Amino acid sequence: MIQYVSAHDDLTLWDKLCASLAASSLGSAVAEGDEENTVDVPKALHDADFSEQGLDAVGPEMAQALRDVLGANRLSAGIVLTSAGIPFMLSGEEFARTKYGNSDSYDSTKELNWLDWNRAWHMRDLIGFYAKLIALRKSDARWFDGNRKIVDTEGDELVFRVGDYLVAVNPSDRTGVVDVAAAAVEGDSGEMHRYWCCLGVSGRGVASAQGEVTTII
């Protein structure tokens, strides 16, 4: 089973998220006419500067749109790289590769299709996030084909356990609370649920373990 959220065909992940999340809230739409393969997205979303100075320069509405897209990008990576099967990535996804909304760029200019290493430098924090997920996956073969125990939740959260790891995905902007004791499996010590530690979070998220519950934002 191949797991992916971007490939050489269609929009890049970053462009998909810009079009579906940020562009709609900022009043952009799919382009028409001769640009049928292009999604019209504000240029600032593509040429993002995620330094605090860069975000301040684009104004609060655009800055929030950028943060939302980045958070969704990280969430997408987290889902793919903790899923069973074989993860697949478009080259450059790890630094938010953009083709400026072009979904069919096979006959476009080399400037549109090449990998922008300056962008990679500016998005190095996102690269670091991908690198940590990849290292985590490579450290335990159970990410590939291990059993997954699903933990019931009251909201939209997806929570499952793989080996000694608990993955909690919260796609909403509401705080979710998970009973980590419900993730116990045969062979756990009676107090194991008290010793979970947070290895990483995506987007604006915060995850903290206290006693028998984990809060995910």
Residue map of PLM features:
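Loop/helix patches that line or flank the sugar-binding groove of alpha-linked glycan CAZymes
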Residues: 1-181
